[in-house]
């Protein structure tokens, strides 16, 4: 099922910065928030407990990639935090992804990263030595992710349709790199607007700087949410 709330990437360096940002929103508004490496390493597991205590949903974006037993053990710990979604690198392999699923259990969504949205085809071929097209690599990883029993993948919106065709229509496609028209793309090579992401079939979208660095973050969030959901029935 699609998520009507854009996921806000909390790319902040400290707990206090997050508190200041969230204080801008009405206390009763339930948000979907992404906690990435920078914030998690700075604030620790307490940041997740804090956000959940405020009634928000949490996507813990740590992109685990290690031997299967280590990932399984780490996922057991994350499951106790009450996260709503977390992820691994598909490049870790099917056995690692299965171990992650077992460790996390079924109460949270588990998705995999295929290729980072900052990766171009030339970079993939040169540095990863994967001599296929970028799309072929993404489809391969998506199939392996489905095989491992995960809920979906992180992918660019340009890849959503081919991934759902290669797996199944209910396979989650979470799309970062979302930018409203006219906003600088930053360091991500493959980007799309919220309306385009909806039309192409994305299930979740992640938006960071266009909200967190906006002059009015609350207005920016609602404008993006309106664009994302404008054609929903």
From Swiss-Prot:
Going by the UniProt record, its keywords in alphabetical order are:
Decarboxylase, Lyase, Pyrimidine biosynthesis
What is the top-level taxon of the source organism? Bacteria
* Lyase in keyword set: yes
Q: Which of this chain's residues are annotated to bind substrate?
A: 11, 34, 61-70, 117, 179, 188, 208-209
* GO CC entries: cytosol
Matching entries from Gene3D superfamilies are given as: Aldolase class I
Known pathway? Pyrimidine metabolism; UMP biosynthesis via de novo pathway; UMP from orotate: step 2/2
Gene Ontology biological-process entries = 'de novo' pyrimidine nucleobase biosynthetic process; 'de novo' UMP biosynthetic process
What residues form the catalytic site here? Answer: 63
Could you tell me the EC number(s) of this protein?
A: 4.1.1.23
Q: What class of enzyme is it?
A: lyase
**Reactions performed catalytically:** orotidine 5'-phosphate + H(+) = UMP + CO2
Task: Extract the PANTHER family matched here.
Answer: OROTIDINE 5'-PHOSPHATE DECARBOXYLASE
Per its database record, what is this protein's job?
Catalyzes the decarboxylation of orotidine 5'-monophosphate (OMP) to uridine 5'-monophosphate (UMP).
How it assembles, according to the record, is: Homodimer.
Tell me the protein's name: Orotidine 5'-phosphate decarboxylase
Give the organism's phylogenetic lineage.
Bacteria, Bacillati, Bacillota, Bacilli, Lactobacillales
